[in-house]
Swiss-Prot record:
Gene Ontology molecular function: ATP binding; glutaminyl-tRNA synthase (glutamine-hydrolyzing) activity
Record-given protein name: Glutamyl-tRNA(Gln) amidotransferase subunit A
GO BP terms in the entry: translation
GO CC field: glutamyl-tRNA(Gln) amidotransferase complex
Keywords: ATP-binding, Ligase, Nucleotide-binding, Protein biosynthesis
Role according to the record: Allows the formation of correctly charged Gln-tRNA(Gln) through the transamidation of misacylated Glu-tRNA(Gln) in organisms which lack glutaminyl-tRNA synthetase. The reaction takes place in the presence of glutamine and ATP through an activated gamma-phospho-Glu-tRNA(Gln).
Catalytic activity: L-glutamyl-tRNA(Gln) + L-glutamine + ATP + H2O = L-glutaminyl-tRNA(Gln) + L-glutamate + ADP + phosphate + H(+)
Length: 484
């Protein structure tokens, strides 16, 4: 059943050829069989999943629900899930049972989508490899020696290995797109504010954005349709009519102007990645798109700006984890200061502490102007690059990451080389624009993703381009042999 597309599953559920109970049990059996080696789930929720599947079958029998009713989903462990352990990959939240649902979870629950469990991730979404999780590294289903990308590595791995038909992720500097690229799946980071952040544990609030991780662009459109939309509980949620992501999927892309930045093909880009991306651009041209050269001259300023701004926001957001109200608490504190210091130093991992320190430093009185304010200026320059480029084209394409998935442990001792793994994805988060990763081939047996970037609120157009590309390629249908 796991080889069916979500569209086929949906049709079979409606036609009573399969039940949600049988479908959900099939995925739970696969998780039992394979997740021991992948470590893609932090928590599996079989009782909840089966209860929700029974309810979904009743909804379908009564003609209620929607296209995704009865289709199971896995949520990244950054989304609060009522009465389910929600850890954000950290010892700090190892015993935290969420008292409410995040908007993303609430929306899928209301539609009758059984929750299979919570997926593994870099601690507090800080990382590009899913190695910094308190629960151990997740492995890449294409090659168990490789990382799945991060921070949404668990969600990418469960889709690639067929341990869930649909999953959610979050993207602060590339955390949906880079793992999607490394695991050969489709993932979209919507425009900032399109998907509510209510109940999504905060890392860097002006960057964080939730989104779908699926096999195909069509499935991403369906899931985005469920989770997007205005939510008054999130002050940054966009108050505007929701786009129709699905009805334009089959539109012709003849005459579409596709921008290719010269800066994306400079030194440091893996040859195999470059050739796959050029082949994908040629496919778009065959579909009638017009290729135009554009420039993003400030691309290299994005990573330094991001690693001042995001840690600054994190140092503020993570101050709430103090050992007092919830989360990890050290044993036998001598006084309040000792409680704070030891709870935080014992509860947070090395990468999280590194970013809190960098952020606190950037915000300190003597350095605020030199670092934080300067980084804000760079952020505007990077955004303006995109605004100017989109005057000449409709979408921008390039690689998602400079290399295919690297080996587990390869970059863990060198934080800067790990940070540079996100050099193509981070600029988009600085600008707050939508972007997606679409499977586009393999380099040395490991998947490569094509990066599609659009102007604000152009998710429907990006999904349309991706869907058209997937009509003439089958990279998104490939599955690692051991999980077929």
């Amino acid at each position: 059943m796991h080889t069916l597309s979500v569209k086929e599953m949906s049709e079979k559920l409606r036609n009573k050829e399969i039940t949600s109970v049988a479908l959900t049990q099939h995925y739970l059996d696969r998780i039992d069989q394979y997740d021991g080696e992948l470590n893609a789930y932090v928590t599996v929720t079989p009782e909840l999943a089966m209860e929700m599947a029974r309810q979904a079958d009743e909804m379908i029998a009564e003609g209620k629900g929607g296209l995704l009713t009865g289709i199971p989903v896995a949520h990244k462990d950054i989304f609060c899930t009522l009465d389910v352990k929600t850890t954000c990959g950290s010892k700090m939240l190892d015993n935290f049972i969420a008292p409410y649902d995040a908007k993303v979870v609430e929306a899928s629950r209301a539609l009758g989508m059984p929750i299979l469990g919570k997926t593994n991730m870099d601690e507090f979404a800080m990382g590009s490899s899913s190695e910094s999780s308190y629960y151990g590294a997740t492995k890449n289903p294409w090659d168990l020696k490789a990382v799945p990308g991060g921070s949404s590595g668990g969600s990418a791995a469960v889709i690639a290995a067929g341990l869930a038909p649909l999953a959610t992720g979050s993207d602060t500097g590339g955390s949906i797109r880079q793992p999607a690229s490394f695991c050969g799946i489709t993932g979209i980071k919507p425009t900032y504010g399109a998907v509510s952040r209510y109940g999504m544990i905060a890392y860097a609030s002006s960057f964080d954005q939730g989104g779908p991780m699926t096999r195909s662009a069509e499935e991403s459109a369906w899931l985005l349709d469920v989770i997007a939309g205005f939510d008054e509980r999130d002050s940054t949620s966009l108050e505007q009519p929701k786009q129709d992501y699905v009805s334009t999927l089959n539109d012709d892309i003849k005459g579409l102007k596709v921008g290719v930045p010269a800066e994306y093909f400079e030194e440091g880009l893996d040859d195999g990645v470059a050739s796959n991306i050029r082949a994908a651009i040629a496919e778009l041209e065959k579909l009638g798109a017009e290729i135009v050269e554009v420039s993003l001259p400030n691309k290299d300023l994005a990573v330094p700006a991001y690693y001042v701004l995001a840690p600054a926001e994190a140092s503020s957001n993570l101050s709430r984890f103090d050992g007092v109200r919830y989360g990890y608490r050290c044993e036998n504190p001598t006084d309040l200061n000792d409680l704070y210091t030891r709870s935080r130093s014992e509860g947070f991992g090395a990468e999280v502490k590194r970013r809190i320190m960098v952020g606190a430093y950037a915000l300190s009185a003597g350095y605020y102007d030199a670092y934080y304010l300067k980084a804000q200026k760079l952020r505007r320059m990077v955004r303006d690059d995109f605004v100017n480029a989109f005057e000449q084209c409709d979408v921008i394409v390039g690689p998602v990451a400079p290399t295919p998935a690297f080996n587990i442990g390869e970059k863990s001792d060198d934080p800067v080389s790990m940070y540079l793994a996100d050099l193509y994805t981070i600029p988009v988060n600085l600008a707050g624009m939508p972007a997606m990763s679409v499977p586009a081939g393999f380099s040395n047996g490991r998947p490569v993703g094509l990066h599609l970037v659009g102007p604000y609120h152009s998710e429907a157009k990006l999904l349309n381009v991706a869907h058209q590309y997937q009509q003439v390629t089958n990279w998104h249908q490939q599955m690692p042999e051991s999980y077929q």
